[in-house]
A protein has these predicted regions:
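A short helix->loop->beta-strand "cap" motif at the edges of active sites that frequently abuts
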Residues: 133-137
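Generic structural signal for well-ordered alpha-helices
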Residues: 86, 122-127, 160
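Catalytic His-Asp segment of secreted/periplasmic serine-dependent ester chemistry enzymes
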Residues: 145-219
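Oxyanion-hole/transition-state-stabilizing segment in secreted/luminal serine hydrolases
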Residues: 54-63, 68-70, 81-119, 139, ...
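N-terminal secretory targeting modules
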Residues: 1-47, 54, 62-63, 219
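Extracellular glycan-modifying ectodomains
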Residues: 123, 127-128, 132, 145-148
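Conserved beta-strand elements of the Class I
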Residues: 47-49, 70
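Short amphipathic alpha-helices and their capping/turn segments at secondary-structure boundaries
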Residues: 36-46, 84-92, 128-130
Length: 219
């Protein structure tokens, strides 16, 4: 009886340790997998992947009714997170186009992360996508100017500029800048585009993204 108790205790301990060492957003990814197991969205669509600006865009398909979209934004993910889960949130869908919004959280989560580091992380993800999906167009939406993160703007703009310069030299890519269109007359983020947390957008903010992004989406 004592040995059995010790065995159960050890098994429970191992299970707890495994749960504690799971990478960030593991549960989000498992939720996608479960969803796909019962209702796989299909292949050959436009894939939106990235952080919470996509996660919270629940009605994205309504903004782009003529473009079939699979939204795989998750949590407050970073570029490292998207790269970690690329085999789960990108490649299974064999998309005809990939739209990425990510990088803001890399900067917000770590004061040592520079715009150059964000660019290097993006380049890693981009290289992975190109190696598996060489003919698939890639769209990157610039990191937005958020009121709550305005003090980080120098790092954000550096990252945007480096990514823009990099993509200019790559075929089948588009850099969609939302920066200027989200600024008010005072040159700061237009508060009316954001919800109370001053980070995530409301319908007015998403309407700007719709206008800037739609010309580049495949039918």
């Amino acid at each position: 009886m004592k040995m059995r108790f010790l065995f159960l205790l050890l098994a429970f301990s191992v299970q707890l340790t495994a749960q504690e060492t799971r990478p960030p957003y593991w549960n989000d990814i498992q939720a996608f997998k479960k969803q796909d197991s019962t209702a796989f969205p299909g292949t050959g669509k436009i894939l939106f992947v990235g952080s919470s600006s996509f996660t919270k865009w629940k009605d994205v398909q309504e903004y782009f009714p003529n473009h079939p979209i699979v939204n795989r934004g998750f949590g407050g993910s970073t570029l490292l997170d998207v790269t970690r889960y690329e085999s789960d949130v990108i490649f299974p869908y064999q998309p005809k186009q990939v739209v990425i919004y990510c990088g803001e959280n890399d900067i917000a989560n770590d004061s040592s992360v520079t715009g150059k580091i964000v660019f290097e992380r993006f380049k890693h993800l981009f290289t992975d996508i190109r190696s598996k999906l060489p003919r698939v167009p890639v769209v990157y939406i610039s990191m937005k100017p958020s009121p709550s993160r305005w003090h980080m703007r120098s790092r954000v703009t550096e990252g945007n500029n480096r990514i823009k310069k990099f993509l200019k030299k790559k075929r089948n890519t588009v850099f969609v800048s939302v920066w200027k269109d989200m600024l008010g007359a005072d040159g700061e983020p237009a508060k009316e585009l954001f919800v109370e947390d001053r980070l995530h957008m409301n319908a007015n903010g998403y309407a700007i993204w719709q206008r800037l992004l739609e010309p580049y989406l495949l039918k």
